[in-house]
Curated annotation (Swiss-Prot):
Keywords: Electron transport, Heme, Iron, Membrane, Metal-binding, Mitochondrion, Mitochondrion inner membrane, Respiratory chain, Transmembrane, Transmembrane helix, Transport, Ubiquinone. It is found in: Mitochondrion inner membrane. A ubiquinone binds at residue 201. The lineage of its organism: Eukaryota, Metazoa, Chordata, Craniata, Vertebrata. GO terms for biological process: mitochondrial electron transport, ubiquinol to cytochrome c. It comes from Noctilio leporinus. Heme b b562 binds at residues 83, 182. InterPro entries: Cyt_b/b6_C, Cyt_b/b6_C_sf, Cyt_b/b6_N, Cytb/b6-like_sf, Cytochrome_b, Cytochrome_b_C_euk/bac, Cytochrome_b_N_euk/bac, Di-haem_cyt_TM. This is Cytochrome b.
Length: 379
């Protein structure tokens, strides 16, 4: 008699995805982040569900309802901080996952890569709307500034902004709809993640060498489940330390002041995980140009498969490309730092140089370096 997990209509799908899935023997811990992201999403949905039971999406009571969760609800403070810092862990895993894809050439699985870009956009939208919900100063002004960027779209911009706001400013209607979408989007992200996984399992995983490994596979369970559980334990340890020792480390103190439309904070900035894109937006003095640069800073990932000029898939044996990859990583860290600084000299010029470097490395220098490496290897 066949094993139930191989014959049951539902269990056999789970079995082929998580138990008997053939996986390259050489994949490293950099391949853990997919499962970590699913764990982060599960944590976010669960904590978010419990927060939504006590939260009220009304401008008059939203701030007080968050205070009530932290002070009066049993373990409300830990649920709230798990949710807030869980988002930071989500983005850390997300950026490392994308970085691994870039380094090892996983972007050549174009369907999986493009679904991944959609997932990134959906996650960023969810995080932005979630940041608005506590209705503190930075929530209100962040929502005002970021939604206002859409007014740069010719002809329809102003109407579009007022349509999103549900009025002539960020108000009750805006908060209510942001709460509705913030609740809905994680489930759309979960569905997209399933599609992402579906396309990945059509081709099988890439590996650090970038060489097809059809002849050298091992089952996902128990080998990679153990490895993934180790990664999960490490991530949960970091998240627990963050939540229990310094829960406000990554937040903004301005968000502990209730939203006041008559008082603008001295420095409006988003959460740390958007600062690199915010720095690119601010580095262009023109509004429409800034918005286009902001969108392209993420959308540039979609053209990377077309710019792959190397004869090798992975960067494992390409030292020049490796140097460029780490320069790009440093550039992103500089942009993140600049995004959190005030708009004054010398931060403006540093941001502009770093923004130009970001696009130049990805669109011009990396493809040319790959061609040079091909030539050096006489390919």
């Amino acid at each position: 008699m066949t094993n139930l997990r191989k014959s049951h209509p539902i269990l056999k799908i789970i079995n082929s995805s998580l138990v008997d899935l053939p996986v390259p023997v050489s994949i490293s811990s950099w391949w853990n982040f997919g499962s970590l992201l699913m764990a982060c999403l599960a944590v976010q949905i669960l904590t978010g569900l419990f927060l939504a039971m006590h939260y009220t999406s009304d401008t008059a009571t939203a701030f007080n309802s968050v205070t009530h969760i932290c002070r009066d609800v049993n373990y409300g403070w830990i649920i709230r901080y798990l949710h807030a810092n869980g988002a930071s862990m989500f983005f850390i895993c997300l950026y490392l996952h994308i970085g691994r894809g870039l380094y090892y050439g996983s972007y050549l699985y174009s369907e999986t890569w493009n679904i991944g870009i959609l997932l990134l956009f959906a996650t960023m939208a969810t995080a932005f709307m979630g940041y608005v919900l506590p209705w503190g100063q930075m929530s209100f002004w962040g929502a005002t500034v970021i939604t206002n960027l859409l007014s740069a779209i010719p002809y329809v911009g102003t109407d579009l902004v007022q349509w999103i706001w549900g009025g002539f400013s960020v108000d009750k209607a805006t908060l209510t709809r942001f709460f509705a979408f913030h609740f809905l989007l994680p489930f759309i992200i979960a569905a997209l993640a399933m599609v992402h996984l579906l396309f990945l399992h059509e081709t099988g995983s890439n590996n650090p060498t970038g060489i097809p490994s059809d002849t050298d596979m091992i089952p996902f369970h128990p080998y990679h489940t153990i490895k993934d559980i180790l990664g999960l334990m490490l991530m949960l340890s970091v998240l627990s330390a963050l939540v229990l020792f310094s829960p406000d480390l990554l937040g903004d103190p301005d968000n502990y002041t209730p939203a006041n439309p008559l008082n603008t904070p001295p420095h409006i900035k988003p959460e740390w995980y958007f600062l690199f894109a915010y720095a690119i937006l601010r580095s262009i003095p023109n509004k429409l140009g800034g918005v286009l640069a902001l969108v392209l800073s993420i959308l540039v990932l979609a053209v990377i498969p077309f710019l792959h000029t190397s004869k090798q898939r992975s960067m494992m044996f390409r030292p020049l490309s490796q140097c460029l990859f780490w320069i790009l990583t440093s550039d992103l860290l500089i942009l993140t730092w600049i995004g959190g600084q005030p708009v004054e000299h010398p931060y403006i010029i540093i941001g502009q140089v770093a923004s130009i470097m970001y696009f130049t490395i990805i669109l011009i220098i990396m493809p040319l370096t790959s061609l040079l490496e091909n030539h050096l290897l006489k390919w």
